Regions:
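A broadly tuned preference for mixed-charge, low-complexity surface segments
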Residues: 40-48, 100, 149-159
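A general structural detector for well-ordered alpha-helical segments in enzyme core domains, enriched
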Residues: 4, 33-36, 64-75, 103-107
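A structural motif corresponding to the C-terminal end of an alpha-helix
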Residues: 11-13, 39-40, 71-86, 110, ...
Length: 215
């Protein structure tokens, strides 16, 4: 990547080129890289911003939230230096659907603190639902727990524009089919990772306690 970036940045037509990155926010860009980005017409960053705090660390192990937070803020600050276009492109699963309101609130607050513009309700916000591994899909939740998720999300969906639409879309997808036959597979998957990583799924998702009872 760096060799290609260096070569492109030296082209006479660099000002007509744009770049698109997807990042999981584990590595901060170096100044030399930033200086090269400034030569391009614009740079797009699709941030895999899957949650905050305990939710982030559950999904992005062994990444730590505080480091990811600083990197995200740094990317927001790049909007003050050159034309960079930043999008929230999270993948929504059983592990993080409950954290959508909190992560959206963090995004708005920190965008307004660190970016060159005020948050726009119609800017690039594009969460997508997880399809693989299938046992992590929100469609696996039993109806009782889907109702709990929907109750929290509907209550806290005080957003406007694309964020509001995104939460509603995730609720609709969650209810779109019943994959609860995969619940034992989800139980095995989460317990295996919790034991291996010394984590606890329920710290990030207390509303789902009891979901595996009887399995």
């Amino acid at each position: 990547h760096f060799k290609l970036l260096d070569k492109l940045s030296k082209q006479d037509t660099v000002g007509d080129m744009y770049l698109n990155y997807s990042t999981n926010l584990t590595i901060a860009p170096k100044q030399d890289t930033i200086d090269k980005w400034k030569k391009f017409k614009y740079v797009e960053f699709a941030l895999s911003f899957d949650g905050i705090e305990d939710t982030w660390e559950l999904i992005r192990y062994p990444s730590k939230w505080k480091k990811a937070e600083r990197i995200t803020q740094k990317i927001f600050e790049l909007t003050k230096e050159f034309d960079c276009r930043i999008g929230l492109r999270s993948t929504v699963s059983v592990n993080n659907i409950l954290n959508m309101p909190e992560s959206f609130t963090w995004w708005i607050d920190n965008w307004n603190k660190h970016a060159s513009t005020s948050f726009d309700i119609n800017q690039w916000i594009n969460p997508t639902h997880l399809t693989f591994p299938e046992q992590l899909s929100t469609t696996v939740l039993p109806l009782k727990y889907k109702d709990r998720v929907a109750e929290k999300l509907n209550k806290r969906n005080i957003f406007e524009g694309k964020m509001k639409d995104s939460i509603e879309a995730q609720i609709n997808y969650m209810y779109s089919k019943d994959d609860s036959h995969l619940l034992p597979k989800l139980k095995f998957y989460n317990e295996f990772l919790d034991n291996k990583r010394k984590q606890n799924f329920y710290i990030a998702n207390p509303e789902l306690k009891g979901m595996f009872d009887g399995l």
